[in-house]
Amino acid sequence: MEVKIEESWKEMLKGEFCKSYFKRLVNFIKNEYKTKKDKIFPSPKLIFNAFDSLPFKDIKIVILGQDPYHGKGQANGLAFSVNSDIKIPPSLQNIFKEIERSLKIKTIPNGDLTRWATQGVFLLNSILTVEEGRPSSHKDIGWEIFTNEVIKIISKNLNNVVFMLWGNFARGKKELIDASKHLILETSHPSPYSAHNGFLGSNHFSQTLKYLKEHNKISIDFQ
């Protein structure tokens, strides 16, 4: 079936788009947008924003989230990211805090992480849509099958990618990644409930920049 997505991704994922689970998923999502109008996030054109913002071959880092923010106006299709006019959520505040601590830089007080995506950071939620006020409402409808395949395709076809797995949900994806050719970084989730259990002080960002340099890749400006 025809899916509107960046061309290099369309080529890599064309096999998935033809599978029966994906067709059922698309039909379900279309019906959700039709019947619940503006209560499904992000907007339809931003569902594949993480893919549209970064061609496949340009991926240097994968940061894995669970599902989109469920507040109105927050989700923009990039994991942990919000639109620029939205207050920065607590988890993202902690991400910025760890960047500042680890890299000794000052971050921009703007929650739109498009500036990271265009440099090579693939901000992937495992579940790509959500209903307003109902976290995980689109769990087990097919998105996890799709995004698990995305992770496996990245692992198989690219080399020396950094995978940042924060929290038990993300860490559960470790088995999908070939650790012999990629760097896997694991710690607690940046949520205020768990950030002090490892995330703050993890040095994931400094480790990532060191790894990119060692493998002759252009660095990322995490400001």
Curated annotation (Swiss-Prot):
Family: Belongs to the uracil-DNA glycosylase (UDG) superfamily. UNG family.
Gene: ung
EC number(s) given by UniProt: 3.2.2.27
Record field: catalytic activity: Hydrolyzes single-stranded DNA or mismatched double-stranded DNA and polynucleotides, releasing free uracil
PANTHER family: URACIL-DNA GLYCOSYLASE (PTHR11264:SF0)
Lineage top rank: taxon: Bacteria
Record InterPro entries: UDG_fam1, Ura-DNA_Glyclase_AS, Uracil-DNA_glycosylase-like, Uracil-DNA_glycosylase-like_sf
Keywords: Cytoplasm, DNA damage, DNA repair, Hydrolase
GO terms, molecular function: uracil DNA N-glycosylase activity
CDD domains reported for this sequence: UDG-F1-like
NCBIfam families: PRK05254.1-1, PRK05254.1-2, PRK05254.1-4, PRK05254.1-5, ung
Cystine pairs: none
Chief location category: cytoplasm
Signal peptide (residue range): none
Described function: Excises uracil residues from the DNA which can arise as a result of misincorporation of dUMP residues by DNA polymerase or due to deamination of cytosine.
Source organism (scientific name): Borrelia turicatae (strain 91E135)
Subcellular location: Cytoplasm
Protein name listed in UniProt: Uracil-DNA glycosylase
Keyword Hydrolase: yes
Active site (UniProt): D67
Gene Ontology CC, one term: cytoplasm
SMART domains assigned: UDG, UreE_C
